Amino acid sequence: YSSENNFYTAVKNEYPEFLEKNKIESSLNLFYVAAYLFGNDYRFSRPHIASQAFPDMELTNINIARFFVADRPELYYWELAQISQKAGWTNGTFTIILNAVEEDYIKVDLNRYIHKSLFSVAPDAIDSIRHQLEKLVGDSGYYGIFAIFNYDGFPLIDYEWNEHLLQSIIENYDLGFKLLEPTVKDRRYKKGIIVPQSNPCQSFEEFVIAQMKIDGITSIAKDAFSGYLRRKGLVLTATIPIELYDGDGLRLEGNNFVFG
């Protein structure tokens, strides 16, 4: 197996004259040249290259991820980062691979993953978690996962409570709740809004617009909007999520955010 980046680096080190003669200046160019020349001997699916001896699988990101982690019972972020560096994946490919890994694993904290087949929460604990979420969401109909600083009300389980574990449980168990997250994510912090599963909003932007409609707001100055989002408990910091600047329904016109 090789990524296109590692392949390009190897060719650049061993056969620089070949790249220069054929005016190949990027891993992308070389990938397609190699696919044309060696398509019968190797398998190519950007950014992955595999020999015929590589396990017989479609070269998708999820399959490549599963090959490298090999169903380990427990994974750490640093291990995945190490695999990525050795494989020569770009940051973008690593992010895609990381998301693929999370289809098979439960993220229990910032750096640790447990295979789904080995992770469980007792039914009575699930009921207790559901009850606690109902209390948090309360009359407002939502609660920012980033605003939970104390987990004393949550049941004692085999893992230490944190926002990553809570999000994993919400996403993998039938609690009657879902998370609406800003499009641009940061793996270090959770920015989602917990809402009942029955809430009609399908995106963070839709939910923000719904709150503005409730408050009778159709236009609001940029500086005031930042404060509004924080007062409503929709964000933790003063930074306005990027998708609100030019979304499907909400956008920045001049110095004002408007929708409709």
Language-model segments: residues:
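C-terminal non-catalytic scaffold/interaction domains in large multidomain proteins
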Residues: 1-260
